[in-house]
Amino acid sequence: MLIIETLPLLRQQIRRLRMEGKRVALVPTMGNLHDGHMKLVDEAKARADVVVVSIFVNPMQFDRPEDLARYPRTLQEDCEKLNKRKVDLVFAPSVKEIYPNGTETHTYVDVPGLSTMLEGASRPGHFRGVSTIVSKLFNLVQPDIACFGEKDFQQLALIRKMVADMGFDIEIVGVPIMRAKDGLALSSRNGYLTAEQRKIAPGLYKVLSSIADKLQAGERDLDEIITIAGQELNEKGFRADDIQIRDADTLLEVSETSKRAVILVAAWLGDARLIDNKMVELA
């Protein structure tokens, strides 16, 4: 497994792979890898000849400096996990390598609408940072496919739109959420939970499933469903942050023509902001 830290070396390897006619898959990550990331890697390996995993804690997508400062950097352990998975290439650049003149004056990619609604409204600049780094990685790695987790539902929708709008010839693969046995969605942020909070955390998925059950039973008073769900989260020890029920295909308000809904939930548990989602077919 190659570990590359500079743009010239990465370009050199990508040129070689292209000359050899290899099908390349990219898995963009911020490191601190868990089994959910490994599921992305496995999906990439099944679909391509060569798998490139990027590990870069992107300062442009953090709306709070303290979050950036405390985000775990575990490059050695991450590379050991990826080596066991037989990943071909790890791209682990420094911030200086990606943003040589800093982030303030760096060219950015913005996806109007999707970047400022829902999760984007509570995290200003976050999705602009995501679309900028992902587009830069697409230009550098030139993958045939790229794999992203469905846990970050809005992020996946944003990347699909960016790819369509910018004409990237890349297949975007959404990989289903991987959960612990108790239902908690795997996330790097779960590491912020205390032992006691970890026992409470599966309650998020229980509330999510309760909303889904109501929708499947034909309930359509979305405001009431959301209000009750927020109360349930708070009673379980969370601080409900945002609960939305949206059209799964557009992320707009659910309408009579909506065929699928996505339930998007964000809640604080101690210092960890947990997010989860669930899709529901609307009869």
Swiss-Prot record:
<feature type="binding site">
    <location>
        <begin position="149"/>
        <end position="152"/>
    </location>
    <ligand>
        <name>ATP</name>
    </ligand>
</feature>
<comment type="pathway">
    <text>Cofactor biosynthesis; (R)-pantothenate biosynthesis; (R)-pantothenate from (R)-pantoate and beta-alanine: step 1/1.</text>
</comment>
<dbReference type="GO" id="GO:0005524">
    <property type="term" value="F:ATP binding"/>
</dbReference>
<feature type="binding site">
    <location>
        <position position="178"/>
    </location>
    <ligand>
        <name>ATP</name>
    </ligand>
</feature>
<feature type="binding site">
    <location>
        <begin position="30"/>
        <end position="37"/>
    </location>
    <ligand>
        <name>ATP</name>
    </ligand>
</feature>
<comment type="similarity">
    <text>Belongs to the pantothenate synthetase family.</text>
</comment>
<keyword id="KW-0547">Nucleotide-binding</keyword>
<dbReference type="GO" id="GO:0042803">
    <property type="term" value="F:protein homodimerization activity"/>
</dbReference>
<dbReference type="Pfam" id="PF02569">
    <property type="entry name" value="Pantoate_ligase"/>
</dbReference>
<feature type="active site" description="Proton donor">
    <location>
        <position position="37"/>
    </location>
</feature>
<comment type="subunit">
    <text>Homodimer.</text>
</comment>
<feature type="binding site">
    <location>
        <position position="61"/>
    </location>
    <ligand>
        <name>(R)-pantoate</name>
    </ligand>
</feature>
<keyword id="KW-0436">Ligase</keyword>
<dbReference type="InterPro" id="IPR004821">
    <property type="entry name" value="Cyt_trans-like"/>
</dbReference>
<dbReference type="InterPro" id="IPR014729">
    <property type="entry name" value="Rossmann-like_a/b/a_fold"/>
</dbReference>
<dbReference type="GO" id="GO:0004592">
    <property type="term" value="F:pantoate-beta-alanine ligase activity"/>
</dbReference>
<dbReference type="GO" id="GO:0015940">
    <property type="term" value="P:pantothenate biosynthetic process"/>
</dbReference>
<dbReference type="GO" id="GO:0042802">
    <property type="term" value="F:identical protein binding"/>
</dbReference>
<comment type="function">
    <text>Catalyzes the condensation of pantoate with beta-alanine in an ATP-dependent reaction via a pantoyl-adenylate intermediate.</text>
</comment>
<feature type="binding site">
    <location>
        <position position="61"/>
    </location>
    <ligand>
        <name>beta-alanine</name>
    </ligand>
</feature>
<protein>
    <recommendedName>
        <fullName>Pantothenate synthetase</fullName>
        <ecNumber>6.3.2.1</ecNumber>
    </recommendedName>
</protein>
<feature type="binding site">
    <location>
        <begin position="186"/>
        <end position="189"/>
    </location>
    <ligand>
        <name>ATP</name>
    </ligand>
</feature>
<dbReference type="InterPro" id="IPR003721">
    <property type="entry name" value="Pantoate_ligase"/>
</dbReference>
<dbReference type="InterPro" id="IPR042176">
    <property type="entry name" value="Pantoate_ligase_C"/>
</dbReference>
<keyword id="KW-0566">Pantothenate biosynthesis</keyword>
<keyword id="KW-0963">Cytoplasm</keyword>
<keyword id="KW-0067">ATP-binding</keyword>
<dbReference type="GO" id="GO:0005829">
    <property type="term" value="C:cytosol"/>
</dbReference>
<feature type="binding site">
    <location>
        <position position="155"/>
    </location>
    <ligand>
        <name>(R)-pantoate</name>
    </ligand>
</feature>
